[in-house]
């Protein structure tokens, strides 16, 4: 190539190299390396794809609605479909759980892990807000890991409690309240009973005059439900006062408050909300947290 | 162009006539000519070796005894196992795969430090399959000249027949490539039987379809464009190379000035310098990516060395020494031009470092692989609640413990806890017998159990006592242990 011929060509980078675009900044020239044409066509294809997408799927917001797309797809129906797929997938394992008696599930390692896995998820969804993520409980909400049960810790008792609840309005649910003694007993009497109750679990000395007075008041007013020796009664959901485990707190002020105003925590009935299989799984899960009897 | 020529000359400072060059360029058809030579033979050997391994490996059997697949290489997704001859990788041992990837990267770096992009030229799947597809193309449509002539000419029945035949063979190869891929994920003979009787899974058919399409497109149609536009390796390689790396290089000091054999002979007689390059363009014609190696190192060059073979053949014919194009380092080229002794430095900081790292990681992996046990235990302490006070005043901690049995037979393990004298251990769902808590696990399986540890005595406030969970095989006595803590209020 002669120089005169080259003069009306774009400048070239070195011998035989690609031409430059002619743009120059501080002596740096931009090479003109054309993109491959298929690249351009790929770009056009994505644009066409975008138009197709607008038509096929929900895409554009309108004043009070949105374009729904000719495919009729929406995320809500997609979720419904996925859940039904999941249920189909789980049908076999759910059937296994449903057909085996509650007492036999824990004897079978496969069923046990199945029930615990399902129970864990159901617990997190439904029970954790009150009982805590690991069933550790909170003030007024029993710790499900220990061996202290208000209404009983056998599989059947746990299943009954979950299904029908406590003071839930369900006819078969557990009833029974801790009465408010504020209008029945004097403040001094309540204080004495509180001292006695604390002595039952060894939290306070039992040989003080106050505790001795409290023992008499206890026998007259509290023993009906809590038993003469304060061991409680699971039929009534009355608490065992001799162990060191407290639902609302074991300090004197809290006990005085409990005696004065009474207690009556509510657990909802889960029978109407959860499937029998799920309740079964939940029962096994709670039972195997460690306190199961 | 003509109108531009009539305009007055522009100053060199503003030379812009950029619109003459297109922004987008259609692909320039490349018709690489066949070539014979040492490097071509090497490529043939590697092609047969690598493709042979790829296509046939799934059919190699490896007896692992009962309860285990007998396929030598198997990626078993349903049971989450990876089998490689005598090695069985569990999901939690995925670090071996990570290690292999790191090794692969380092080996690539080492290859690059020693001899440039040899990976690209000889072993890269894109190169190997493109080479195979080119061979089919040459076999059906003829070598460079014949093929070019046919493509430029009118559509005849013969041309159509050849094109149809070529694409059919390509699709067949592509289909078999996809087919071989899925065989790595299931028992190969069974899957083949299922596939031909249309009993195979949708995933298998879809995978084959996708891989057929990509193989056909990438090796048949995209070819060098994958290397030039899509592959990141040329860019990375450019950042990793140095002046001692061997690259396919045109020795311009020997080749220039170019000229015909006659002109060169005349020039030499007259005592003038004459290059060995006779401008025969053979190096360009044989190049599968269509570059001219005489322009120096460039991005599109995959360094397959076919131009070396082509040039050597010409040099032999014109009785000039071979190696006008050769694997040559920048440093050696410069040394030769400066009249200094040749430079060959394969042992240098980066190659030593790469080799040391490869050896270190490789030996480390080997060491852990050899020292692997057939049983394992892992524990997670309950976080919420961390501990529980029982009605009798004792303290209890709960753990989720997973036991691993890598042997291909049922095993029974005795579980015990050390570090907390007097503590009682119980496993949910397991009856306590005379041997204590004995947990059975099926072959090649894991089992998760909930373990409760109860302590009667008093603990210091805020106690966190180190404990060790231990399992012991009831038959062989093999043990495994894991450390955790017993926590008090």
UniProtKB/Swiss-Prot annotation, chain A:
The UniProt entry's GO biological process terms, in alphabetical order, are:
oxidative phosphorylation; proton transmembrane transport
Q: Which GO terms describe its cellular component?
A: plasma membrane
Pfam families reported for this sequence: Cytochrom_C (PF00034), Cytochrome_CBB3 (PF13442), FixP_N (PF14715)
Pathway(s) per entry: Energy metabolism; oxidative phosphorylation
TM spans (from-to): 43-63
- Biased composition, class Basic and acidic residues, residue ranges: 1-11
Disulphides:
none
Subcellular location, in the record's words?
Cell inner membrane
- Residues binding heme c 1: 127, 130-131, 267
Query: Per UniProt, where does heme c 2 bind?
Result: 178, 222, 225-226
Read off the Gene3D superfamilies from this record.
6.10.280.130, Cytochrome c-like domain
Q: Does the keyword DNA repair apply?
A: no
Q: Where is this region: Disordered?
A: 1-25
Xref: InterPro entries: CcoP_N, CcoP_N_sf, Cyt_c-like_dom, Cyt_c-like_dom_sf, Cyt_C_IC, Cyt_c_oxidase_cbb3_su3, Cytochrome_c_Oxidase_Subunit
Domain Cytochrome c, by residue range, is: 114-201, 209-290
Q: Which family does it belong to?
A: Belongs to the CcoP / FixP family.
Subunit organization:
Component of the cbb3-type cytochrome c oxidase at least composed of FixN, FixO, FixQ and FixP.
- What task does this protein carry out? C-type cytochrome. Part of the cbb3-type cytochrome c oxidase complex. FixP subunit is required for transferring electrons from donor cytochrome c via its heme groups to FixO subunit. From there, electrons are shuttled to the catalytic binuclear center of FixN subunit where oxygen reduction takes place. The complex also functions as a proton pump.
NCBIfam families the record matches: ccoP
Protein name according to UniProt: Cbb3-type cytochrome c oxidase subunit FixP
- Which species does this protein come from? Azorhizobium caulinodans (strain ATCC 43989 / DSM 5975 / JCM 20966 / LMG 6465 / NBRC 14845 / NCIMB 13405 / ORS 571)
Q: Which gene encodes it?
A: fixP
């Amino acid at each position: 190539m002669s120089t005169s011929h080259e003069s009306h060509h774009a400048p070239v980078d070195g011998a035989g190299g690609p031409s430059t675009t002619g743009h120059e900044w501080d002596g740096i020239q931009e090479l003109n390396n054309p993109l491959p044409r298929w690249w351009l066509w790929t770009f056009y294809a994505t644009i066409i794809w975008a138009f197709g997408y607008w038509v096929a799927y929900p895409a554009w917001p309108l004043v009070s609605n949105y374009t729904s797309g000719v495919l009729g797809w929406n995320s809500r129906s997609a979720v419904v479909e996925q859940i039904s797929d999941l249920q189909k997938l789980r049908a076999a394992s759910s059937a296994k759980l449903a057909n085996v008696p509650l007492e036999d599930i824990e004897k079978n390692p496969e069923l046990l892990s199945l029930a615990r896995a399902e129970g864990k998820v159901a617990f997190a969804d439904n029970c954790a807000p009150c009982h805590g993520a690991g069933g550790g409980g909170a003030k007024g909400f029993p710790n499900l890991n220990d061996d202290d049960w208000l209404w009983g810790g056998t599989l059947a008792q746990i299943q009954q409690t979950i299904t029908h609840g406590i003071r839930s309005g369900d006819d078969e649910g557990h009833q029974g309240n801790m009465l408010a003694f504020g209008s029945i007993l004097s403040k001094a009497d309540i204080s004495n009973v509180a001292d006695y109750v604390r002595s039952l679990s060894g939290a306070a000395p039992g040989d003080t005059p106050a505790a001795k007075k409290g023992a008499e008041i206890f026998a007259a007013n509290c023993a009906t439900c809590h038993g003469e020796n304060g061991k409680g009664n699971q039929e009534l959901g009355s608490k065992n006062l001799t162990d060191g485990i407290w639902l609302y707190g074991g300090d004197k002020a809290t006990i005085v408050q409990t005696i004065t105003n009474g207690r009556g925590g509510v657990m909802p009935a889960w029978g109407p909300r959860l499937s029998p299989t799920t309740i079964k799984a939940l029962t096994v899960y709670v039972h195997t947290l460690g306190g199961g009897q | 162009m003509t109108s531009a020529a009539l305009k007055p000359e522009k100053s060199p400072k503003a030379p812009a006539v950029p619109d003459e060059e297109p922004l987008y360029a259609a692909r320039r058809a490349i018709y690489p000519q066949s070539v014979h030579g040492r490097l071509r033979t090497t490529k043939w050997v590697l092609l047969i070796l690598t493709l042979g391994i790829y296509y046939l490996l799934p059919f190699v059997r490896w007896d692992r005894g009962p309860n285990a697949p007998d396929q030598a290489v198997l990626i078993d997704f349903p049971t989450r196992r990876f089998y490689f001859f005598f090695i069985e990788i569990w999901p939690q041992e995925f670090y071996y795969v990570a290690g292999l990837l790191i090794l692969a990267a380092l080996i690539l770096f080492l290859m690059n430090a020693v001899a440039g992009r040899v990976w690209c030229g000889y072993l890269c799947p894109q190169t190997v399959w493109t080479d195979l597809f080119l061979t089919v193309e040459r076999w059906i449509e003829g070598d460079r000249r014949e093929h070019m002539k046919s493509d430029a000419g009118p559509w005849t029945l013969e041309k159509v027949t050849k094109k149809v035949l070529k694409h059919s063979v390509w699709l067949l190869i592509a289909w078999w490539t996809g087919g071989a891929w899925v065989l790595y994920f299931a028992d190969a003979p069974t899957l083949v039987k299922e596939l031909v009787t249309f009993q195979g899974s949708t995933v298998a058919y879809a995978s084959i379809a996708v891989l057929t399409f990509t193989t056909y497109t990438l090796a048949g149609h995209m070819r060098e464009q994958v290397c030039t536009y899509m592959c990141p390796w040329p860019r990375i390689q450019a950042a990793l190379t140095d002046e001692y790396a061997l690259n396919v290089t045109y020795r311009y000091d020997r080749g220039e000035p170019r000229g015909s054999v006659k002109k060169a002979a005349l020039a030499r007689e007259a005592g003038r310098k004459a290059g060995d390059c006779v401008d025969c363009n053979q190096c360009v014609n044989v190049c599968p990516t269509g570059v001219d190696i005489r322009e120096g190192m460039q991005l599109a060059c995959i360094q397959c060395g076919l131009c070396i073979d082509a040039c050597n053949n010409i040099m032999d014919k014109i009785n000039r020494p071979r190696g006008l194009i050769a694997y040559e380092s920048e440093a050696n080229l410069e040394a030769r031009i400066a009249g200094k002794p040749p430079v060959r430095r394969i042992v240098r900081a980066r190659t030593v470092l790469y080799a040391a790292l490869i050896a270190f990681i490789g030996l480390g992996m080997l060491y852990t692989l050899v020292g692997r046990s057939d049983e394992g235990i892992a524990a997670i302490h309950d976080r919420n609640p961390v501990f529980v006070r029982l009605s009798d005043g004792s303290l209890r901690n709960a753990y989720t413990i997973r036991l691993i049995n890598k042997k291909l037979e049922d095993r029974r393990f005795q579980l015990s806890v050390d570090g907390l004298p007097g503590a009682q251990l119980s496993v949910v769902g397991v009856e306590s017998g005379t041997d204590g808590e004995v947990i059975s696990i099926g072959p090649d399986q894991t089992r998760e159990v909930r373990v409760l540890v109860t302590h009667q005595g008093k603990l210091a406030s805020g106690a966190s006592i180190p404990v060790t969970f231990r399992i012991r095989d009831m038959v062989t006595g093999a043990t495994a242990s894991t450390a955790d803590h017993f926590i008090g209020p």
